[in-house]
Amino acid sequence: MQSSDKTDEKRWLGRFSNIDAITGLCVLAVFLFGIAAAFSSKDTRNLTVVADVPIYYPVAPPEAAPAPSDAADKLAPEAAPQPAPAPDQPQAKQLANSSPAFISLLGDDRLEASYYLSQSKAPRDFYGGRWAPENIESTANGTTFSVKKEGNTDVPFSIAEASTYKRYGYGRYEAIMQIGKGSGLVSAFFTYTGPYFGDPHDEVDIEFLGKDTTKIHFNYWRNGKRGKFATFDLPFDASEGPHLYAFEWLPDRITWYVDGVPYYASELNDPFIPKTAGKVHFSHWTGIPKMREWHGKPDFGTEAVTTVSCSSFTPMGEDKRSCSDVYKEKKNS
């Protein structure tokens, strides 16, 4: 009886040994299959090395975090770390017609040397006033862009806009601006090209509404189609002093900055990222009555001013003097 028990015991132990061996082989096979599948996947974004300081989107300043506005345009992309380019990825090419780096200290530099001043005799499109070159002036603090009441029923307002003669592509765009305050006003810093120039409508924007200058708006367009725009609260009132605003437009992503802090970015490889070099624009305007639901009824007195004291462009992959340097120098002084 005892001998039989020992035989059964050996038999059961042998079975468990076989089961353990089979289980181990199964686990090893699954592990090897997972590795093979990962490396054979066409989408290798999850395998790339994350940058030393990963950026998550939307991005908020560490101290006073801007929350997305309660407005209808709360379309921030889901949070995702920004991957670094793969080592074997070819360097992205600059867009055709893109010009070299520049920096303009507006107020000191003669604006007309680099910028075209928009001009019209009457309101057109969705703009509620005539473009008036005389509403752009150089001052000790920078170049002012004024919106004025005209007292004319047909032309109730005069508005201001300047755009570069040259076109610019991938790189970092910066401006130091103090925004005009008052319901009905729109201040904008953006790149644009479109059918007027024989191009698709491509655009990257930073916009402010004078009715609430504690908010900032980010937009982008490709071939007339709008990407995922967003509105953020600022930790300051943009009408009370100059601040540094910027966006970095790259082939696979656009990132927007306020005072050097990243606030928002498009999704990686978003199909709405522009692909055509455009002109740099600054504008200050009020719209036709249909636009008042967005920017408010004009109620800013007889004149309101947006001031731009610096504008710069640094091409992708280059390191040039920019408005960031000017802003730091002014703060330090």
Regions from the PLM with identified roles:
Residues 11, 15, 19-26, 33-62, ...:
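GH16 jelly-roll
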Residues 1-14:
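N-terminal Lys/Arg-rich, disordered targeting/topogenic segments
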